[in-house]
């Protein structure tokens, strides 16, 4: 399901089309998708965002040449502010990174600065970039989401089409503050309909949310077609509207595709800080 599958902003995307791979730096390969495309149907407007947050990208396949032609490799972390005008389409991001492969840069800082400049221009917003040598990750364990997993419920599931109404009247319990986790989030690319696999962490303070209803709601994304960032904002919006928590944070970490993973988080709590460690499937 998608309300904007044929939106004009999607017509020029390379996603889902045969493309040539370039190995010389080309910033024009980056393509933007307006965030308001999915936000307007959710009644989310840029002058009054109900959340703050970011899209955290991990760049696993990043290589360039130093000024003597010696290949360099790094793992990159990019944080794109959720208040930016656009999100960055992931296939175009991959093609853009490939264009670094045979391009010479003076030093690592030049690569960071190039990435930051180009991504900020494409997104029309704030971007933070950090590149890491591979030994930075020595002895770093696989991380887990903190919180209570809701996946092992003894329920029968027969419906997999998106349905926000599972959350209707789902918050009837006592006042609590808790962190819930599910690894059963699966949605599909808006354009190609390829599956996107993720884990989601929901931290809220408010009336206790029925866990069966919440799990059925998350499972209903299984046939849903949207980009990662849009799914997280939809989850946030639906929980906020239908469960009305006092505080809410939604954070999803998706498995990688094309050497990239995308990990969006949205919160209305000033105290929320997303953990950035890789999960088991990443």
Swiss-Prot record:
Residues where substrate binds: 88-90, 228-229
NCBIfam families (alphabetical): QueF
Assembly and interaction partners: Homodimer.
Catalytic activity: 7-aminomethyl-7-carbaguanine + 2 NADP(+) = 7-cyano-7-deazaguanine + 2 NADPH + 3 H(+)
Protein residues bound to NADPH: 90-91, 257-258
Main location: cytoplasm
UniProt name for this protein: NADPH-dependent 7-cyano-7-deazaguanine reductase
Residues of the active site: 189 (thioimide intermediate), 196 (proton donor)
PANTHER family per UniProt: NADPH-DEPENDENT 7-CYANO-7-DEAZAGUANINE REDUCTASE
Pfam family, one: QueF
Family: Belongs to the GTP cyclohydrolase I family. QueF type 2 subfamily.
Keywords, alphabetical: Cytoplasm, NADP, Oxidoreductase, Queuosine biosynthesis
GO molecular function, one term: preQ1 synthase activity
InterPro entries documented for this protein: GTP-CH-I_C/QueF, NADPH_dep_7-cyano-7-deazaG_red, QueF, QueF_N, QueF_type2
Localization (cell): Cytoplasm
SUPFAM superfamilies to which the protein is assigned, alphabetical: Tetrahydrobiopterin biosynthesis enzymes-like (SSF55620)
Domain of life: Bacteria
Organism of origin: Photorhabdus laumondii subsp. laumondii (strain DSM 15139 / CIP 105565 / TT01) (Photorhabdus luminescens subsp. laumondii)
A single GO cellular-component term on record: cytoplasm
Enzyme class: oxidoreductase
Function (record text): Catalyzes the NADPH-dependent reduction of 7-cyano-7-deazaguanine (preQ0) to 7-aminomethyl-7-deazaguanine (preQ1).
């Amino acid at each position: 399901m998608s309300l904007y599958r044929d939106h004009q902003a999607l017509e020029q995307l390379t996603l889902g089309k045969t493309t040539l791979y370039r190995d010389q730096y080309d910033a024009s390969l980056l393509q933007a998708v307006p965030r308001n495309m999915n936000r307007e149907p959710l009644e989310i407007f840029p002058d009054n965002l109900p959340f703050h947050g970011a899209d955290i990208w991990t760049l696993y396949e990043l290589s360039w040449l130093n000024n003597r032609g010696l290949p360099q490799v790094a793992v990159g972390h990019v944080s794109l502010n959720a208040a930016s005008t656009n999100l960055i389409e992931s296939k175009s991001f991959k093609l853009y990174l490939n264009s670094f492969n045979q391009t010479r840069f003076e030093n690592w800082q030049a690569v960071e600065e190039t990435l930051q400049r180009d991504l900020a221009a494409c997104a029309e917003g704030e971007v933070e970039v950090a590149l890491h040598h591979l030994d930075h990750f020595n002895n770093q364990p696989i991380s887990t989401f903190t919180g209570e997993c809701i996946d092992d419920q003894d329920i029968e599931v027969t419906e997999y089409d998106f349905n926000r109404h599972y959350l209707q009247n789902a918050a009837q319990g006592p006042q609590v503050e808790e962190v819930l986790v599910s690894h059963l989030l699966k949605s599909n690319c808006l354009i190609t309909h390829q599956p996107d696999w993720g884990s989601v962490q929901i931290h809220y303070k408010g009336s206790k949310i029925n866990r069966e209803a919440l799990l059925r709601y998350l499972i209903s994304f299984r046939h849903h077609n949207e980009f990662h960032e849009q799914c997280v904002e939809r989850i946030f919006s639906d929980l906020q509207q239908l469960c009305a928590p006092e505080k809410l944070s939604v954070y999803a970490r998706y498995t990688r595709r094309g050497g990239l993973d995308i990990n969006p988080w949205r919160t209305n709590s000033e105290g929320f800080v997303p953990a950035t460690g890789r999960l088991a499937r990443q």
